[in-house]
Amino acid sequence: ATLKDITRRLKSIKNIQKITKSMKMVAAAKYARAERELKPARVYGTGSLALYEKAEIKGPEDKKKHLIIGVSSDRGLCGAIHSSVAKQMKNDMAALTAAGKEVMIVGIGEKIKSILYRTHSDQFLVSFKDVGRKPPTFGDASVIALELLNSGYEFDEGSIIFNQFKSVISYKTEEKPIFSFSTVVAAENMSIYDDIDADVLQNYQEYNLANIIYYSLKESTTSEQSARMTAMDNASKNASDMIDKLTLTFNRTRQAVITKELIEIISGAAALD
């Protein structure tokens, strides 16, 4: 490569490094807010899931309709955050289909749709976009829950797959159960709550669905921002390594050019003598 080519590459990498450093700073600010909001949001999820655990609610084996919700966002540059959710969804779909279940999927975020739509377009019930641009609110979760309830697909049980935040450098792809109102009512252990009015239980079940979606959105957002922060930090470090190597190559090439020119000058002077 010529000195001009190396200079052009150096300039390009330095510009990219400026972008990755800026993106890391933005992700760090968003991560700090997401982590701060995650702790109170976890109460929504753990409280709602506690009912299913304590009542030991399980989907009946003879029921076939299953729903899988995948949580991602509209933005990338955050490692394997979205592909890990898609992989888990594919594994679940394959297992459930093999067991004779009817499976429909819901994509929260454009990324999950772009990964799965080509191969599973016939199984998409609904998808949601404009996710991840702003911190998710309970209102966003309520809109998604309402859309699912009004979709006309009367699933018996299902699951929501998302990335659960563990630390600033780690997350885990998690799966939590969701159930239809009819499945909850039919559960054996629900008989201990016989004094609960059916309308009250249905309202609570709908509220539960919104709670679990809100909880998963908050977990996913925090995981995404921490992963993006890490990815941009790694990209900046890799850019620094490339800049160092190219600078060394540039200096060696320049030295070789200067040496060659000196030899030519000396040879020319010797020829004149």
Curated annotation (Swiss-Prot):
Superkingdom assignment: Eukaryota
Residue(s) carrying N6-acetyllysine: 14, 30, 90, 113, 129, 172
Biological process according to GO: cellular response to nitric oxide; proton motive force-driven ATP synthesis; proton motive force-driven mitochondrial ATP synthesis
Localization annotation: Mitochondrion inner membrane
Modification Phosphoserine occurs at: 121
CDD domains: F1-ATPase_gamma
Keyword annotations of the record: Acetylation, ATP synthesis, CF(1), Hydrogen ion transport, Ion transport, Membrane, Mitochondrion, Mitochondrion inner membrane, Phosphoprotein, Transport
Entry-annotated residues carrying N6-succinyllysine: 24, 90, 129, 245
Pfam families the record matches: ATP-synt (PF00231)
GO cellular component terms attached to this protein's record: mitochondrial inner membrane; proton-transporting ATP synthase complex
Residues annotated as signal peptide: none
Membrane topology label: Peripheral membrane protein
GO molecular function list: proton-transporting ATP synthase activity, rotational mechanism
Biological role: Subunit gamma, of the mitochondrial membrane ATP synthase complex (F(1)F(0) ATP synthase or Complex V) that produces ATP from ADP in the presence of a proton gradient across the membrane which is generated by electron transport complexes of the respiratory chain. ATP synthase complex consist of a soluble F(1) head domain - the catalytic core - and a membrane F(1) domain - the membrane proton channel. These two domains are linked by a central stalk rotating inside the F(1) region and a stationary peripheral stalk.
Subunit annotation: Component of the ATP synthase complex composed at least of ATP5F1A/subunit alpha, ATP5F1B/subunit beta, ATP5MC1/subunit c (homooctomer), MT-ATP6/subunit a, MT-ATP8/subunit 8, ATP5ME/subunit e, ATP5MF/subunit f, ATP5MG/subunit g, ATP5MK/subunit k, ATP5MJ/subunit j, ATP5F1C/subunit gamma, ATP5F1D/subunit delta, ATP5F1E/subunit epsilon, ATP5PF/subunit F6, ATP5PB/subunit b, ATP5PD/subunit d, ATP5PO/subunit OSCP.
PANTHER family linked: ATP SYNTHASE GAMMA CHAIN (PTHR11693), ATP SYNTHASE SUBUNIT GAMMA, MITOCHONDRIAL (PTHR11693:SF22)
Family indicated by similarity: Belongs to the ATPase gamma chain family.
Protein known as: ATP synthase F(1) complex subunit gamma, mitochondrial
Species this protein is from: Rattus norvegicus
